[in-house]
A protein has these predicted regions:
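Bacterial N-terminal signal peptides
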Residues: 8-15
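Short helix-initiation/N-cap motifs at beta->coil->alpha
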Residues: 24, 78-95, 138, 176-188, ...
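Extracytoplasmic small-molecule ligand-binding "clamshell" domains
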Residues: 24-105
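Bilobed "Venus flytrap"/periplasmic-binding protein-like clamshell domains
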Residues: 38, 44-47, 57-74, 110, ...
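Periplasmic-binding protein-like
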Residues: 43, 126-137, 201, 209-248, ...
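Extended ligand-binding regions for polar small-molecule ligands
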Residues: 62-71, 137, 144-145, 149-150, ...
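Acidic, polar ligand-binding/catalytic clefts
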Residues: 66, 77-145, 285-292
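A ligand-binding cleft/hinge motif common to bilobed small-molecule-binding domains
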Residues: 92, 106-117, 161-169, 188-225, ...
Length: 293
């Protein structure tokens, strides 16, 4: 099956009449009228949003989004609300949201002040550090050790933008290759086409864990900014964003998010960071990395 055109639909329901707060929210009104909520997912963003062995979208962000869907079903009194899952990429995820193709984007999208000009973000659900992965044999111990080398980062991400800015500011003279997705970027390091792959640490851990020989690779911290992740929603729909935030914050307050976190990150041996603990204790949708120090 071609995952680029993968489309999953669960349950079936005739279109619903708008109900209550749905009339105050364009997104809720659309969902109520069509009887469908459309979720954008990534196919290779382990452990946030990816396809499992049965080619079904799964992951930390997907699980959070299904909890949001439960809250929407409750708000609309529509227990049979249909969920449609659509694959998105770094290149088209914003356009899909702006054009109404997806109602929630559930992947590993970093909340930035620049992106907030086009879309809105839920309260932060994860805080990643920007790191690099290289083969241990290369003995790379810092971003500066890559000076004059060919490196790769995923196109359309905040990591590749930060890498370019830092390389220029520090005179690192890097040849930066944009990978189409995380898997392609990592494969360039595997094939020695790039000395290192610069990306969010948690995504690198997922890729290394799935590699043929994980022991060949080292993940190294950098001085690039942290990356706060959130669920993407449409801008200028505060009623819908409020519902999304309330569903996530409920998981924070109940402590259930701890169990969900362990489910997806314990296999990668990634304990919850102080920055994420802070964001859970005091929920925020800030796109400023300084807010997570």
């Amino acid at each position: 099956m071609n995952t680029r055109h993968l489309l999953f639909a669960f349950a079936a329901l005739l279109p619903l009449a708008p109900h209550g707060a749905a009339q105050e929210s364009p997104t809720l009104r659309k969902i109520a009228e069509t009887g469908v909520i459309s979720i954008g997912f990534r196919d290779k963003s382990i452990p946030f949003s990816y396809l499992d062995k049965q080619q079904r979208p799964t992951g930390y962000s997907i699980e959070l989004c299904y909890r949001i869907v439960d809250a929407i079903r409750t708000r609309l009194k529509a227990p049979g609300l249909e969920v449609m899952l659509r694959p998105v990429t770094s290149a088209n995820r914003s356009a899909f949201m702006l054009n109404g193709i997806v109602d929630l984007e559930c992947g590993s999208t970093t909340n930035t002040l620049e992106r907030q000009k086009e879309v809105a973000f839920s309260v932060t659900t994860f805080v990643a550090a920007t790191s690099l992965v290289a083969k241990k044999a290369a003995r790379i111990d810092s971003l500066q050790a890559l000076k004059g080398s060919t490196v790769v980062s995923t196109a359309g991400t905040t990591a590749i933008n930060a890498l370019g800015d830092t390389a220029q500011a520090q005179g690192l003279d890097l040849h930066i290759i944009p990978g189409r997705d995380h898997a392609e970027a990592f494969s360039m390091v595997e094939a020695d086409r790039a000395l290192a792959f610069v990306m969010d640490d948690v995504l690198l851990h997922g890729l290394v864990a799935a590699a043929k020989d994980p022991g060949m690779y080292a993940i190294v911290a950098t001085d690039l900014p942290v990356q706060p992740y959130g669920i993407v929603v449409r801008k200028n729909d505060p009623e819908f964003k409020k519902l999304v935030d309330e569903a996530i914050v409920a998981l924070f307050k109940s402590g259930e998010v701890q169990q969900i976190y362990r489910k997806w990150f314990a296999p990668l041996q990634l304990p919850m960071s102080p920055a994420l603990k802070k964001a859970i204790a005091a929920p925020t949708d800030s796109g400023d990395p300084a807010a997570y120090r």
